Every structure is written in structure tokens, then in C-alpha cells.
Amino acid sequence: MHYKNIKLYSYTFFLCLLIFGCGQDKSIEKNYQNHYDIESGGRLINAMTGEPSNLIAMIAGDSASSAIANNIFNSLLKYDESLNYSPDIAESWSISNNQKTITFKIREGLFWADGEKLTSKDVMFTWKLVTDPNTRTPYASDYQLVKKATTPDPYTFTVTYEESYAPALDTWTSLHILPEHLLKNEDVNSTYFSRKPVGSNYYKLKNWKSGQQVSLTRNTLSINGKANIDNLISRIIPDTSSQFLELTADNIDLMSINPIQFQ
């Protein structure tokens, strides 16, 4: 009888602990408005399911190519965090009263990663390249609507459309400007440049190991200033389950997930 009482008291004691413990448990509130100091240096490793076909976005039809090329090249304009137009290579732009002409003012003092100056000549060259019938690109149609393009000086690029075109500015956010001095005598469809690009953005190509990874390193001549991360590495891991195992093992820092994995 004494033994049964001890068991009963024990069960009652632990039940009380459980009840009061749960009652005092308070959910931790997270403040997502907190701001933290930005750290500089190090590397970021992400996983990609496919290998880039090349690093010239206008002739690439895959997302892997564009994702990496976006870190190497700039466009005339870009979107800010509120999806408003923001300066990139162009510091300003104006639209004529008849809505047919756009004048872009190019920022002065810009350089390619190899030290050559970036000017309106490069913008004109890129427009001619994307509209060239010999360039195998699916993106030409938007730029073929331009009936006239001029470069009055090294820092001005003007385009005139046959008719007013509402998405005109949008199209100039996605066209990567390419260096004329490296591509003017090249066939863009087969050039070495597609695997050894020279751009103007935060990063430049360090090495490309086919089937394994593409490594970028900080471009000290970036037109947008110093990147916070020294190196970006994109590892090619076709299977998402393998990517997840690499993520849990801390061998990669980022991966894309599907809705099932999110749940």
C-alpha cells in the first residue's frame, strides 16, 4: 500500500510540473525589423541544378546563365527594392514629350574589369549586337522597335521609337551592356568571351570548372563600388535532394526549395 501511494504521489508531482511548465511557456517573439551590421569578406556558396550554357545573357536561354551573368554585367537601368527604376550605367534618363525618344546620360568614370573605359560606344555596340540578324537571341524584338539610336557624346545614348512604347524602360533594365573593345571582331554566338567574360558589376569570373562549379571574385573596378562578399561560388548539383543534404552538412549556404520542401 505504501508503494502504491509513492507511485501515486510521483505521478501527481510530475503531472503538476508538466501543467505548470506548459502554462509558463511563452512563445518567443521575433523582431524582423532588427538591423544588423554588415560584415565584409568571406564567401557565399549556392547550389544550381543546371550548368550555365554561357555567360552572355542575350544568347542564353537558361536561368543559370542569367543568374551568374547578373553579377558580372550591368544594364542602363535597374530596379530598386520597391521595383522603381534606379540608375545603373545610366545616371539619369529623360523621355520626350511625344513619348518616342529616351535620352540616357551615362555615368562618367566607369571602367570595365580590365581597366578600359565604359562609354556610350559600348551601349551602342550592344544595341547593334542584339538587333543583328546574325545574333542568335530570343530578345531582339523589343530593341528592333528602336528606329534610330545615336551617341552625341561619350556619355549620352539616345533611342527613338517609331511609336510610343510603354515597356521601353523595362527593356533597358534587362539588356547587359557588353564591351565593344573585346567583342567588336568576334562572333558573339561562338566567342571565347562567353566563358571568359569581362564585365563592370560587383564580380568577375575567377574560374569555371565544367560540371562542378562557377566561381566569381570581387571586381575592384565595379561601377557600383565594393562588394561585401569576396567570393561567390555556384556549385552544380542537379539533384535537389543532394542539395538539401549538402545544405544540412554546411557545405553550401543557399539552395532553391520547392513548395513541398518548404512545408
Predicted regions located by residue number:
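Bacterial N-terminal signal peptides
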Residues: 10-19
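Bacterial signal peptide processing site
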Residues: 22-26
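Short, well-ordered beta-strand elements
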Residues: 40-50, 91, 101-104, 123-126, ...
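N-terminal lobe/hinge region of extracytoplasmic solute-binding protein
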Residues: 47-97, 128, 198-199
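Gly/Pro-rich hinge or "lid" segments in bacterial periplasmic/extracellular proteins
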Residues: 80, 173-227, 231, 241
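Aromatic- and charge-enriched surface segment that lines or borders ligand/interaction sites
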Residues: 91-136, 158, 243-248
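Surface-exposed binding/hinge segments that line
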Residues: 141-183
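Ligand-site clamp/hinge motif
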Residues: 220-263
